[in-house]
Design a protein with these regions (language model features):
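Aromatic-lined substrate-binding rim segments of carbohydrate-active enzymes
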Residues: 67-68, 80-138, 271-276
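Short, well-ordered coil/turn segments that N-cap beta-strands
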Residues: 45-47, 74-76, 110-114, 176-181, ...
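Short, acidic/polar
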Residues: 58-70, 288-296, 356-364
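N-terminal export signals
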Residues: 2, 8-30
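Polysaccharide-binding and catalytic clefts of secreted carbohydrate-active enzymes
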Residues: 144-304, 318-319, 325
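The substrate-binding groove and active-site-proximal loops of carbohydrate-active enzymes
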Residues: 49-57, 84-98, 145-162, 251-264, ...
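Carbohydrate-binding surfaces of carbohydrate-active enzymes
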Residues: 235-238, 311-711
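N-terminal carbohydrate-binding accessory modules
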Residues: 36-77
Length: 711
């Protein structure tokens, strides 16, 4: 995969704006636009309050009443058409867009804008009926059937051709309608399926390998295929990671995951190019860190990022994590929360607990405060058929206000209250970032390196755990992809990234030399690019930069091992890099009990103006948080970062600056219980103008906007 950077994506957007992207009259069916040009830089200059709307499922007679009710609730955007392929192309080659043209005309007249979606998540039956070769196949050889969604193989040429045909026709027929402000690619790419093992996918796998390695001997050498007689003489012999009596080579398993996920991202780029033939409007995709795609690479297909989230009230921190991730994904652009539930999530066989009163408005306020431009619901009217009957909606299936209807009104009120503040301010640049790596995710899915009880079982859980640790301490932070630039940061935390590439190491070294502090967390550096064990040093190139020698990489889980870091003692668990330090490297954490006693598990080395910190093992047990908090506080201080405030659990402070240079904090209580937070001495309530003194008291699910000085 080629290097993708935040700076590169931002520069591309700036170049588009400078050159002037092609713009055609809305509603025109003139010649195609230049498919090579991205959409122009854009911002709606308002907050979006949106909902998914499915006119193909309900009587036309309901549309006018729906629109009037949307207006009364402050809904200003609808998203549509992502599941309507069979409505627009009921038989192959016969197109009818009248349902959507009619609705879009009415929406435009009412001042409600539209996000138009490509319908490729739910292909019509004519595409796959009688053609099992066009369907997704899992690792057990089971072929997915028409009847749900994501059943087709995007690797099959006939499927791709049909997808691009409907997208191009949609773009030509609907893409310049005056109601449309943006496009969404597909819907929740690979939410229900993972690797594709169809014949078409495996044929493309062999092409991918050939492009990557050029010659089969290079693959054999990189993967060490003489083990268990896995040696190959042609790329066509290399199997996909289908079910075997035991396990495939780790190199093969991880490579197949990367192939499939990169291929999906490239399919998204191809969708974008189909849209661009007739529309230059911004493009997004409703992503989620759980989905089986290459998230960073997929951003090349998008002009702004968006995501879906269905947290319960107890899972509110997931909203902060995803906002911090997708805000940084395409720098300089807004992000949207494209789907969330008004009261509870649900599908056949399960439903989540219902939101407490007030939580939805708190959720929306958090998204808007953290830089989100859009906050949207799934869905307007409860499904009367299908697989998601229990899911909440703004209106019930019998067209009455739902249990969440009043909460939507509260969101509209919160939006109207915050909108003038947010449009007059910009989010302050976070000084701390946590690294998210798609490659690391694939490797850890192949080889779960920490099996202790209570530790996150998924890679995203590890990253979210670190994010929450920083969030709960009251630091302003974000999450950056592996290939992102490190500009503007003072502290970088990279947990659980087994392979550290040359390019990442060079960027990190430059970041440190300029004064940054890099904390490389447990497992980082313990594997090579092709998911092999380094043979030159325990942590590969990272070890040389850190000025250490790794004596052992060993599992501490269940051994009772302990360590001391900066005066704090804790049990340790998971995999540990036990090290000795070279001259110029300081030991700051030592194993105090168990195997490897006396060796270092945390070191720091000054490089230029900054420091590289190696954290070789994770604290565990009762004093886990004490050790991690000490580590973060200490190195944040070394990097010149101060906490915004001593925030109790559940309170989030979002620092922003208005157009006059004044510091504005949005303080949110994401819990139902009352909370209080200490403030700078000079703090004024923006809405009342009153001085707040040294303490701010927050009722459950409330937000305060304050102006502060001296911070």
């Amino acid at each position: 995969m080629s290097s993708i950077s935040r700076r590169g994506l931002f520069s591309l957007a700036g170049k588009s704006a400078a050159l002037g992207a092609v713009s055609l009259p809305l509603g025109s069916l003139a010649g195609p636009v230049n498919a090579a040009e991205p959409a122009p830089y854009y911002r709606q200059n308002k907050l979006i309050h949106g909902v998914a709307y499915y006119p193909e499922l309900w009587p036309d007679a309901d549309i006018d009443a729906d629109i009037a009710e949307m207006q009364s609730l402050g809904i200003n955007v609808v998203r549509m058409a992502e599941f309507a392929w069979s409505t627009m192309e009921p038989t192959q080659g016969n197109f009818d867009f009248s349902v959507f043209k009619n609705v879009m005309d009415k929406m435009h007249a009412a001042g409600i804008q539209v996000v138009l979606c490509t319908p490729t998540a739910t292909p019509p039956v004519w595409l796959t009926h009688g053609h099992p070769e066009r369907c997704h196949k899992n690792d057990k050889g089971e072929i997915m059937s028409h009847g749900a969604r994501q059943h087709a193989s995007y690797e099959h040429p006939a499927v791709r051709k049909a997808c691009f045909t409907i997208i191009e026709r949609m773009s030509r027929e609907l893409g310049r309608h005056p109601s449309v402000i943006a496009w969404q690619l597909d819907n929740e790419m690979k939410a229900h399926v993972s690797e594709d093992y169809s014949d078409a996918a495996i044929a493309n796998w062999h092409k991918w390998l050939k492009k990557r390695f050029k010659h089969i001997d290079a693959l054999n050498k990189a993967w060490g295929t003489h083990i268990w007689s896995q040696y190959y003489t042609a790329f066509e012999q290399v199997p996909a990671s289908v079910t075997t009596p035991f396990l495939h080579n780790a190199s093969l398993i991880t490579a197949y995951k990367m192939f499939c996920r990169e291929s999906v991202a490239d399919f998204m780029v191809a969708q974008r190019d189909s849209i661009r033939k007739y529309s230059d409007l911004p493009i997004t995709h409703n992503d989620n860190p759980a989905f089986n795609i290459h998230h960073e690479r997929s951003m090349l297909a998008q002009d702004f990022a968006s995501y879906d989230a269905y947290p319960t009230a107890a899972q509110w921190s997931a909203l902060a994590f995803r906002s911090d991730l997708y805000r940084a994904a395409i720098p300089g652009k807004p992000f949207w929360l494209m789907e969330t539930s008004v009261a509870h999530n649900g599908w056949l066989g399960n439903h989540q607990p219902m939101h407490p009163e007030g939580f939805l408005a708190a959720e929306a306020s958090l998204i808007y405060a953290l830089g989100g431009e859009g906050f949207c619901y799934w869905l307007w009217r409860q499904q009367r058929t299908g697989a998601e009957l229990p899911h909440s909606a703004v209106k019930s299936a019998w067209n009455a206000p739902s249990i969440g209807y009043g909460e939507v009104k509260k969101v509209a009120a919160a939006k109207d209250r915050l909108e003038p503040i947010l449009l007059d301010t910009t989010l302050d640049a976070p000084p701390i970032a946590i690294t998210y790596s798609d490659h690391a995710r694939a490797m850890i899915e192949t080889e779960g390196l920490d099996k202790r009880s209570g530790f996150p079982s998924r890679y995203r859980g590890v990253i979210e755990m670190w994010h929450k640790q920083v969030l709960d301490l009251g630091y302003h932070r974000e999450v950056r992809f592996e290939n992102a630039e490190l500009d503007g940061l003072k502290l970088l935390i990279t947990p659980a990234m087994p392979y550290v590439s040359d390019s990442f190491l060079l960027r990190a070294k430059d970041f440190i030399e300029q004064g940054g502090v890099w904390i490389a967390g447990p497992v980082t550096g313990t594997r090579g690019k092709e998911h092999t064990v380094p043979t030159d040093a325990g942590l590969g190139l990272l070890e040389k930069l850190a000025g250490v020698t790794t004596q052992y990489v060993m599992p501490l889980t269940g051994t009772g091992a302990t360590g001391e870091l900066l005066g704090v003692s804790s049990e340790l668990s998971g995999w540990c890099a036990a090290m000795t330090a070279h001259e110029g490297t300081q030991v700051v954490g030592t194993l105090t009990a168990g195997r490897g006693k006396g060796l270092a598990f945390v070191t720091e080395r000054r490089i230029g103006k900054g420091k590289l910190v190696l954290l070789g093992a994770m604290p565990h047990g009762d004093n886990k948080d004490g050790m991690l908090n000490t580590l973060i506080h200490h190195y944040a201080g070394e990097a010149g970062i101060s906490r915004l405030a001593d925030t109790p659990s559940g309170v989030v402070i979002v620092p922003r600056t208005n157009n006059r240079g004044q510091k504005i904090w949005i303080v949110l209580n994401m819990l139902a219980d009352k909370r209080s937070v200490s403030l700078p001495k000079e703090a004024i309530d923006v809405f009342t103008g009153k001085s707040l003194g040294g303490t701010l008291s927050l009722d459950g699910y409330t937000q305060h906007v304050i102006q502060v000085t001296g911070v």
